[in-house]
Amino acid sequence: MNGDGTPYLDFSRAEWAALRAATPMTLDERDIDRIKGINVELSVSEVEQVYLPLSRLLNLYVRASQQLFTVTDTFLGKPSDRVPYVIGIAGSVAVGKSTIARILQELLANWPDHPSVDLVTTDGFLYRNAVLEKRGIMHRKGFPESFDRRGLIRFVAALKSGQPRVEAPVYSHLAYDVLPDQRRVIERPDIVIIEGLNVLQGRGTGSYVSDFFDFSIYVDADPADIENWYIDRFLTLRDTAFKDPGAYFHRYADLDDDEARAEAHRIWKEINEVNLYENILHTRERATLILKKGSAHDVERVRLRRR
């Protein structure tokens, strides 16, 4: 472990794994296969060495937060509304954010102090395609201006104000759009994980969703590796989800390998890589914890901000 001269403590994977202590493994291989995303390699050892120690750390933070509320209630002489602990997870497209969010949701829900853990992706707060097309920014989908930032902030602010019932919009990856007639209901969770590309954004004036986070994670990797993962995922989707006639990207289903790779490379270079460098990568240093992945999608180093 080192971290001299930086606001972070830096751990090798082995050093981080040792911090698991006696935390029990509560997931088996079937659970992990169910949780992991498309083209994301995730083993039992990865969960044991990386995510169990992280769940232990988060459990300690959540317990401390709960104890602080108890102290405040004692001071005020009356109980206050229960407020969830909010964790943000950021990083590029195809870096594995969603898989990490689901793993943490499962692990954290198995701790006795906070059995209710909800997961919300910011995709639901994208403007509908019709709005993006009207504004001429459909090609900027996923960039900060394509999100209903105020709606997202209102949602998280409602959570942190202790409202007993909060609703979030629902996004369909098949339709590649927000579903106008569906809402996700969240009722009195102990923890809420919010996962999205730009959730650590905080430049300029005004409020940002990251202002409401109690803990934040940035999933980091070499951009060349992320591009490879994106292309591999595109090829897998071509052979699976894109085959559905109702899929927004059904037009890609009949591409051969060379055509699919060329199209995925174009999309990466023109959209996702630009978004990474312009809007996502610079938010890395705002995270409480950084998970650094290697080319095989496995976490090689962990950086924890000094508190």
Model region roles, listed by residue range:
Residues 43-76:
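N-terminal pre-Walker A segment at the start of P-loop NTPase domains
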Residues 87-106:
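Glycine-rich phosphate-binding P-loop
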Residues 106-118:
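Post-Walker A helix-loop "phosphate-sensing" segment adjacent to the P-loop in P-loop NTPases
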Residues 2-23, 29-44, 51, 199-307:
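Conserved NTP phosphate-binding and transfer environment spanning the P-loop NTPase/kinase superfamily
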Residues 69, 77, 81, 150-211, ...:
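Glycine-rich phosphate-binding loop used to anchor ATP phosphates in small-molecule kinases
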Residues 84:
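Short coil/loop residues immediately preceding or within conserved phosphate-binding loops
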Residues 65-80, 245-259:
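Short mixed-charge
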Residues 36-50, 118-121, 125-177:
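Conserved nucleotide-sensing/catalytic segment adjacent to the nucleotide-binding pocket
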